[in-house]
Amino acid sequence: MISSNDLRPGVSVEIDGAPYKVIEFLHVKPGKGAAFVRTKLKNMQTGNVVEKTFRAGETLPAATIEKVEMQYLYAEGNNLVFMDMETYEQAPITAAQIGSAVKYLKENMQVSILRWNGQVIDVELPNTVVLEVVETDPGVKGDTATGGTKPAKLETGAEIQVPLFIKVGERIRVDTRTDTYLGRE
C-alpha cells in the first residue's frame, strides 16, 4: 500500500482494478479544512489520462509492474515475437499492445517489456535509435543555408523530419520519445 502523501511522478498505483502511473501531483494544504493531494494519472493499459484527488494520508494499492528485458526477433502476421534475455523463451505480442513504439522496432533490438498481472501493458524503447534513411527528397546545393527540414522515411517505416542535407542511405540518430532527428551516426 502507498500513502497518497508518497505519490510522486513515476509511481505506479492500482485504482479500480487498473494500473496507473502518476504523471503530476500537487499537495494542497488549504487554510481551512484537511489537506489533499491532486494528481494526474495515466492508465497504463489504455493510455488515458485522468485527474484524481485523494485525501492526505489515504492509502492506495501499489501496482506491481514487472520489467523484463527482451529482444525483438521478427514480425509474424499481426504478432511481434520477442525473446526473454534470461530464459530465452519466445513470446508473441500484438502490435496493438505495443502501440506507437512499433515504428522504431528493428530486428535484434533490446527493449524493456512492462507487465502487470502477466499482461503486457507497455514497451520501453531505448531513448535513441540509429536507423537508415530509405526514402527522402534529394538535397539541392545551398539547402543548408535556410535551415529547413524535409520528410524522410526510415528503414522501419517511420517518417520523421530531417535537415535538407540528409541523403538516402545515411544512418541517423532519432529520439524515440519525441520522434525528432538528433544527428548523423
From Swiss-Prot:
GO terms for biological process: peptide biosynthetic process. It comes from the Bacteria. One of its GO terms (cellular component) is cytoplasm. Pathway: Protein biosynthesis; polypeptide chain elongation. SMART domains: EFP (SM01185), Elong-fact-P_C (SM00841). GO terms for molecular function: translation elongation factor activity. Coiled coil: none annotated. It is found in: Cytoplasm. The keyword Transit peptide does not apply. Keywords: Cytoplasm, Elongation factor, Protein biosynthesis. The keyword Protein biosynthesis applies. InterPro entries: Elong-fact-P_C, NA-bd_OB-fold, Rib_uL2_dom2, Transl_elong_fac_P/YeiP, Transl_elong_KOW-like, Transl_elong_P/YeiP_cen, Transl_elong_P/YeiP_CS, Transl_elongation_fac_P. Involved in peptide bond synthesis. Stimulates efficient translation and peptide-bond synthesis on native or reconstituted 70S ribosomes in vitro. Probably functions indirectly by altering the affinity of the ribosome for aminoacyl-tRNA, thus increasing their reactivity as acceptors for peptidyl transferase. Belongs to the elongation factor P family. PANTHER family: ELONGATION FACTOR P (PTHR30053), ELONGATION FACTOR P (EF-P) FAMILY PROTEIN (PTHR30053:SF12). This is Elongation factor P. It comes from Synechococcus sp. (strain JA-2-3B'a(2-13)) (Cyanobacteria bacterium Yellowstone B-Prime). The lineage of its organism: Bacteria, Bacillati, Cyanobacteriota, Cyanophyceae, Synechococcales.
